[in-house]
Amino acid sequence: MQTILEKLYRSESMNQQESQQLFSAIVRGELEPSQLAAALISMKIRGEHPEEIAGAAKALLADALPFPRPDYPFADIVGTGGDGTNSINISTASAFVAAACGAKVAKHGNRSVSSRSGSSDLLAAFGIRLDLPAEEARKALDELGVCFLFAPQYHTGFRHAMPVRQQLKTRTVFNVLGPLINPARPPLALIGVYSPELVLPIAETLRVLGYQRAAVVHGGGMDEVAIHATTHVAELNNGEIESYQLTPQSFGLQSYPLEALLGGSPEENRDILARLLQGKGDPAHAAAVAANVALLLKLFGHEDLRQNAQQALDMIHSGQAYERVTALAARG
């Protein structure tokens, strides 16, 4: 371990195996707080490489509680958080709409990082049980097309890093790991990142981790597909990565200002999304969710983004997405 730490102090990068070794020690609580802080800051200053991020993700997945992985195609839709926009929970709403469109979504999430309401905060406000046992969550995925996996329930080793992360008060590799350590190990993922510089490195990390198809996005300051600006995308498909840009017009949608997507407390966000998913919501909110669902559906092989967005809007207006919310809450 000391050899790996010395390497970091010399600003050298680790290979995947070394990173996996380091992060295995971290989640087992084997590092002193000072060593952990030094390792995280050394990586941050030099810039984390895809092989290192992948090694860390593998260590955390190896340490995670097991989830009965389905053999059918399913996806995660998740953002790093930390984009500072305090928007409504677009990815959470998108998971329910995508499920209503026939996709299977196992969403991995946590409590809020930067906004006043993370995906877990919102689901709790809907009365959805966060700590559903793995077998029951899998059943929800089979039957409703959507389930939610609460990170602290599966990743108990994370707690060893928490005090140091809180003291450092700065982003570290842990801020990008959340979306990469879904215990269900989905083959498909739509991942939003808080900075455009992360789009390609995270796509490369997903390639190392063996994802079949995934899209990493950043849109105008948001860790989602944007309807107020251009979205930068790196799409991984069978080992090849293609970078491109999308605008609201790519989805046949009109643009809306970022202010139109502002969220509030978990209770306020719940009311906003309840109206939206019942087909009575704000057109800007519907457009934002439709754009994200459209790109997610592309990963399942539905290549026409405009058609996908229209299907998502139809599903939103029909109120069928909200039935998934109430059905999931009823399993509590």
From Swiss-Prot:
Record note on cofactor: Binds 2 magnesium ions per monomer.
GO biological process, one term: L-tryptophan biosynthetic process
Known pathway: Amino-acid biosynthesis; L-tryptophan biosynthesis; L-tryptophan from chorismate: step 2/5
Binding site for Mg(2+) 1: 91, 224
Catalysed reactions, semicolon-separated: N-(5-phospho-beta-D-ribosyl)anthranilate + diphosphate = 5-phospho-alpha-D-ribose 1-diphosphate + anthranilate
Swiss-Prot/TrEMBL keywords: Amino-acid biosynthesis, Aromatic amino acid biosynthesis, Glycosyltransferase, Magnesium, Metal-binding, Transferase, Tryptophan biosynthesis
This protein's record includes keyword Transcription: no
Membrane-traversing stretches: none
CC annotations in GO: cytosol
EC number in record: 2.4.2.18
Chain residues that bind 5-phospho-alpha-D-ribose 1-diphosphate: 79, 82-83, 87, 89-92, 107-115, 119
InterPro entries: Anthranilate_Pribosyl_Tfrase, Glycosyl_Trfase_fam3, Glycosyl_Trfase_fam3_N_dom, Glycosyl_Trfase_fam3_N_dom_sf, Nuc_phospho_transferase
Cofactor: Mg(2+)
A Pfam entry, by short name: Glycos_transf_3
GO molecular function: anthranilate phosphoribosyltransferase activity; magnesium ion binding
Protein residues bound to anthranilate 1: 79, 110
Binding-site positions, Mg(2+) 2: 223-224
Coiled-coil region: none
NCBIfam families assigned: trpD
Family: Belongs to the anthranilate phosphoribosyltransferase family.
Role, per record: Catalyzes the transfer of the phosphoribosyl group of 5-phosphorylribose-1-pyrophosphate (PRPP) to anthranilate to yield N-(5'-phosphoribosyl)-anthranilate (PRA).
Subunit structure: Homodimer.
The protein's name: Anthranilate phosphoribosyltransferase
Gene source species: Serratia proteamaculans (strain 568)
